[in-house]
Structures are given as C-alpha cells and as structure tokens.
Regions:
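Flexible, membrane-associating and regulatory peripheral segments of lipid-active enzymes
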Residues: 1-9
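Patatin-like phospholipase
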Residues: 10-18, 24-108
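Short hydrophobic segments within beta-strands
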Residues: 19-20, 120
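A short alpha-helix-loop-beta-strand transition element characteristic
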Residues: 106-116
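Active-site gating loop/helix substructures
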Residues: 116-123
Length: 123
C-alpha cells in the first residue's frame, strides 16, 4: 500500500475561524489573532472563508469580515471596552453596546462583508 496520500483533483474546503465570547477576554482573542495574522501575512478575511463568533467574538468576527485589521480592532477595544464594562447594570451595558454598534458599524450592510460571517449571541 502506498503510504503517500494524494489529494483529489478538486478539493472542496472551508477555512473556518471560530471566536469565543467573554467580554473583556476579547483582548486575549485579539492577541492570538495578531499572531495568526502575522503568520498568514495577510488580512484574516483573506485567510478564512467563514469567521464565526459568540458574544464579543461575534463583534470581532464582524469587524474582521468587514476588513478591519487586528490592530484596528485592538485599538477600538482599548477605547470602548472600559466604557462598556464600567456600566453597573445589564441594561446599562446593553445601551453602551448599542451606542457603540451604531458608531462602529454605522450604515454598513451584509454586502460590505469581504468574507462569510456567523454570529451567536450568548444567553
């Protein structure tokens, strides 16, 4: 038996990046993504066919799929996460996040995405 595996003539692949949630833990995710982006040598939306995220990971996924660099997202997080996390109530955090979403995403549409994106809200 030949131990060398040969790839089929036509290979259907889907390169998936999955990002977890966890509020301010998004900074850890961004640190890992910075290394992946450096290893790939190109924006992550060019590397992955689908970027999927939960909670803060969904925010990062959407921004990556729109073409933002990891550095740009990290800057955004440094500026805005403390404001959101300072809110003492869930409704206060929700209001702060809604305001941030309007500021960051504005009138962007799904047609603006440069790669596939999936999002899941944590319950």
């Amino acid at each position: 038996m030949n131990s060398e595996l040969s790839a089929p003539a036509s290979v259907n692949t889907c390169r998936l990046l999955s990002l977890d949630g966890g509020g301010a833990k998004g900074f850890h995710t961004l640190g890992v993504l910075k290394e992946i982006e450096a290893m790939c040598g190109c924006p992550l939306y060019q590397t992955f066919d689908l970027i999927f995220g939960t909670s803060t990971g969904a925010i990062i996924a959407a921004l990556l799929a729109l073409g933002s660099s990891v550095d740009d997202i990290h800057t955004l997080y440094k500026e805005h996460v403390p404001v959101v996390m300072r809110q003492r109530t869930a409704s206060g955090k929700s209001r702060a996040l809604a305001h941030l979403a309007k500021t960051v995403f504005g009138n962007r549409k799904f047609a603006d995405l440069k790669t596939g994106v999936g999002m899941q809200q944590a319950v």
